[in-house]
Amino acid sequence: MDVLEMLRASASGSYNTIFSDAWCQYVSKQITATVYMYFALVMMSLLFIAWFLYFKRMARLRLRDEIARSISTVTNSSGDMRGLRFRKRDKMLFYGRRMLRKMKNVSGQMYSSGKGYKRRAVMRFARRILQLRRDNMPLEMRTVEPPAEYLEETIEGSDRVPPDALYMLQSIRIFGHFEKPVFLRLCKHTQLLELMAGDYLFKITDPDDSVYIVQSGMINVYISNADGSTLSLKTVRKGESVTSLLSFIDVLSGNPSYYKTVTAKAIEKSVVIRLPMQAFEEVFQDNPDVMIRVIQVIMIRLQRVLFTALRNYLGLNAELVQNHMRYKSVSTMSGPINSQTSQSSRQAPNGPPMVISQMNLMQSAVSGTGSSGVSVTVTRPPSSPSRHSREEHTLSDPNPNPDGSFHGTTNLFTEVHGDAPNADLFHQQQQQHSVGNLSTRRSSITLMAPDGSHSCLQTPGVTTSIDMRLVQSSAVDSLRKELGLSEEDSHIIEPFVELRELEPNVTLITEGNADDVCVWFVMTGTLAVYQSNQDATRAKQDKSDMLIHFVHPGEIVGGLAMLTGEASAYTIRSRSITRIAFIRRAAIYQIMRQRPRIVLDLGNGVVRRLSPLVRQCDYALDWIFLESGRAVYRQDESSDSTYIVLSGRMRSVITHPGGKKEIVGEYGKGDLVGIVEMITETSRTTTVMAVRDSELAKLPEGLFNAIKLRYPIVVTKLISFLSHRFLGSMQTRSGSGAPGAPVEANPVTHKYSTVALVPITDEVPMTPFTYELYHSLCAIGPVLRLTSDVVRKQLGSNIFEAANEYRLTSWLAQQEDRNIITLYQCDSSLSAWTQRCMRQADVILIVGLGDRSHLVGKFEREIDRLAMRTQKELVLLYPEASNAKPANTLSWLNARPWVTKHHHVLCVKRIFTRKSQYRINDLYSRVLLSEPNMHSDFSRLARWLTGNSIGLVLGGGGARGAAHIGMLKAIQEAGIPVDMVGGVSIGALMGALWCSERNITTVTQKAREWSKKMTKWFLQLLDLTYPITSMFSGREFNKTIHDTFGDVSIEDLWIPYFTLTTDITASCHRIHTNGSLWRYVRSSMSLSGYMPPLCDPKDGHLLLDGGYVNNLPADVMHNLGAAHIIAIDVGSQDDTDLTNYGDDLSGWWLLYKKWNPFTSPVKVPDLPDIQSRLAYVSCVRQLEEVKNSDYCEYIRPPIDKYKTLAFGSFDEIRDVGYVFGKNYFESMAKAGRLGRFNQWFNKEPPKRVNHASLNEYTFIDLAQIVCRLPETYAVNTAELFSEDEDCDGYISEPTTLNTDRRRIQVSRAGNSLSFSETEMDSDVELDLKLERKTDKSTQSSPPSNSRSDMRGKEEARHMSNWHWGVKHKDETGSGATEATKTQTGQEQELQQEQQDQGATAEQLVDKDKEENKENRSSPNNETKN
């Protein structure tokens, strides 16, 4: 009341201004009237309540008086009733009815009638009068903190293992898996060395023949430069080792080396375990398979760790290989030629002359060397003049073409007659080297020129047939020496040596090819080795390959790919006219069976080619294996190294001062971890731990410094890398980590390499679901689907045993490297395969049926226990026929607090059709040939898993938001899928409509109806209230939004959705991804002054329009995982052309300028405009960052002429947005900029090609090949997916051999398919059906062709069986007889088919069927699968 007295005093004359007195009087009257009005309203309400209670009490008294009068009347009329009594049954009836009346009153409180109903009606009326509304709050999502294991590392001690044995076990793990007896034998050779501070562990000129493991203390490893200075490479701490794997190969191959530049000195008192490398040689004599596996692991480490780190991240290519090696004299390798041969016409442009003197020929003939029985016919056509005019290729200009490409190059193994790429000499001659005739082949060799004519060593125009036995003998002798074989072993390699003469620029093998791997030996000429350019800064300018080194005569190449079993890391081409001798991969493996030690010589050949830099790096680089939960480094530790993720997944967690832990990011395969902290020399800011079993390469800081001093290009590479990372962090900094932001708002990489698929119940159609997801992923890139049956077929039935751990993990790692994503389909039980899937998965998809119970099963809880740190996402399936929308999603999420994200997937009818496994494979073999629907939920899920999601951001702007509907229609017509939607203000409304309906017609209709309601002014007038907080109460506005959406939660939307609001309680923005949809849409549309802030149901914070802080939240969408974003801005444009009025401003002057028509108008903002500009200051800054970002396509339709409240022009504004959007996307398509949004559109259907098959490129275990380890299934690599690839299901589904097909068909003859059949049987029967069709279609061709084709297939099949190892002996000894019978039966079958030359393909199949029926009837003839 002090204010009222002050105003009354001012009205009485304290102020002399008329205007002030009038204003004060008016205000005092209004306040007085308001107080009186509210007082009168309260008094009238109290009087009404008192009158109502009085009336109710009087009615009750009148009723009681009437009952009393009735009783008295009955008493008077009946006389004295004291002698009367009730019968027992009447008493029971009376008390029973009385009890029922009581119970009815109690139960009636649950309904809208009964006791208390009138009281509730009065309370509702009073609440409506006093604005005391209490809504029924819906079910809220329970916020459960992740378990401690999710953000904390595992700290477990190994008390049962002594420290020295534990450190040694961890150190020699880089050599592969050792069995316990082998490990114990190695431990016997260990020695303990005690060093004081300053003592040398080893120094220059000491023999490099030991592995050193630090048990305690610290050792400094440094290199000595030529000027006498030293540079530290790394500091070896407790548990780490000092060794060079390249020196390990030198010692085992009999060429021990010495330390030339590397020295190790103790920093403090230390105890070091010394393990001589000779101890391994003793073990390898008794276990040759262990030696071969160790050499293979070393070569794999060399290729994956050294080359990956130095090439991809430091930009070193040619610096890794010695280009100037010792030139070897190979005078007898070119063979005898005619004395009249013109040297000038046969001399290569850059190679040595291909001429051998007659003296060398006579000397070789007298010495008796040669290969008897081998004759070579060599012819040569006239060479073209252009061949001699070709430019010389040097290191400075390696490319023959002016544009830097190799357009004119040809492949050595391409067919000489025609251009068919699938028919090549390499694969044609594979059929000539089958297992049966490799050891006995003594055929004549014809040197063919690439143009299809015979090659000759004479003058052009002269064709002569000469004896080339000396050339063959010289090639055999040279390759024998390179492989470390004695002269007595010449007969072993002699049948496998082949000769070729190459024209310039003939490609022997391309980078990434695993089919044409050979060991090539250069006899004359030169080979050039290239590698693709990995420099990201030059990728758009220089597409040519980079020259690495030359291979001169007397040198060998191809050993690295041969030993690793992986694809070739280089492209090899002939630089000039070159003659080579080579041995194919299959032949090398057969030689290994007889002489396993050739792997040492092959490895030594690879090591000799490497530069001294690689050997120094080999001392510094470490290969680290981390189990799930183990920490790479911890927060606040010193940063002296960086790490490269080779496989697995890492998680970075920060611990705040209060002890709270938060996820900072996640790293996948190929990411660099800890590089910024190491370069800036700061302590670790986070703790990085392994989410699953991972492999890392550790690069110490000293190695970086040493390489930077020698090769300055590394600095440029690092600057480029850090610049991209810094720019990316700047773009994602805003919006992340804000209060109220979900966990997904952290900069976590949503790109996964391995995905595990787990069914909740047995009712989930897991196989069709995996097929559909596979189909959608094929449109993005190479993908692989693995099941337990597929792995058993490929690697054997005992592959899940502990003894085969190395083989299984290596095979899976290789498959993951070849594909952008690998799908692991788990079993329906907790089997060994399911546990392996959990260990391999980057993310786990828990698949359930959305219309079934949400309860958690026991199997699901076990999965969460096995993989606590792995991210888990829920996938709910809905049948398309039911037309049902997602509901009750919150119950699913509350029951599974470990789920971080959910997906709703609408499934077509074929997914839920109950079919046998065979029919499912048959169905999807046809589905795979079709184009996947890029707008389906499966494609949306596929893009999310691969990090290619497309986000749509709709900005605020009032009635101008109708343009969003037109833009949505234009986006749909342009073929752009929408995977995520976010909106603010009117954009939140339109985006929520699209996520809920996904039909442009329904969305347009609902948006139009809502806009019409906003034009009904009489409803708005009824919503007016006293303007203390806002002009409107918001009741009618809430009703319009609630009628549009209903009681739907954000979790129940088909498409992931978020909206943004301004939290004026905490002075920040809030991102809403769950909760009541209409409430948060209403909050995001609450314009200050017009609508009151909405109270957040979760914590009561006041929420206003999100446009005040971010009117176009494209940055938030990017943080949530969208890779490509379309942002549509419909906000108002502020006028920036304002009048400069000087230092002061008079309102009278503005009023004069406004009303005087003879003066020029001025542009000065008024009070509301200034308040609006102040409110949108942060929004404007955020909008400028979005416009300048590289991940966002900013679009603004021409809708500036429409006002914010022009809701009546809905159709007109929508048409403007549609026309503009259609033209905009058409122009983008013409300019080629639309590809990143619809790059899956109009793409050819995924076709299964031979090179992508599991069988044609898989992990090769040399130890298994050499030692013939037992396998259950012999996989046919030559014929798999060749004939029936168009209807055979997924490319990752290997089938069985033809003999197995026929046998399984016979065993199932006469039986119908059932739902319990396994996938293995189903694939076989499908292949049999397709094989019959293929055989029938070949009847029209000549019988000779059919016989030759079948003979070639059988030879390829036997080659494949030899390649992968034939099962000849069971582990228990019981399988030897069965395996022998199986092999004998296959040979007899092949001989019988070759004898039946007049039979057609159909007759052969029928004959095999009859023979198998007879074998089935006889127990002694059965074969074991």
Curated annotation (Swiss-Prot):
Key words, A-Z: Developmental protein, Endoplasmic reticulum, Hydrolase, Lipid degradation, Lipid metabolism, Membrane, Neurogenesis, Phosphoprotein, Transmembrane, Transmembrane helix
Topological domain spans for side Cytoplasmic: 56-1425
Membrane topology: Single-pass type I membrane protein
Domain named PNPLA: residues: 952-1118
Motif interval(s): GXSXG: 983-987
Transmembrane portions of the chain: 35-55
Annotated binding of a nucleoside 3',5'-cyclic phosphate 1, by residue: 174-301
SMART domains cross-referenced by the UniProt entry: cNMP
Region (Disordered): 332-410, 1330-1425
PROSITE patterns for the chain: CNMP_BINDING_3, PNPLA, UPF0028
Free-text tissue specificity from the UniProt record: Isoform A and isoform B are expressed in the entire brain cortex; cortical cell bodies of adult brain. Sws and Pka-C3 are colocalized in all neurons.
Lumenal topological segments: 1-34
Top-rank lineage group of the source organism: Eukaryota
Main location: endoplasmic reticulum
Family: Belongs to the NTE family.
Name of the featured protein: Neuropathy target esterase sws
Gene: sws
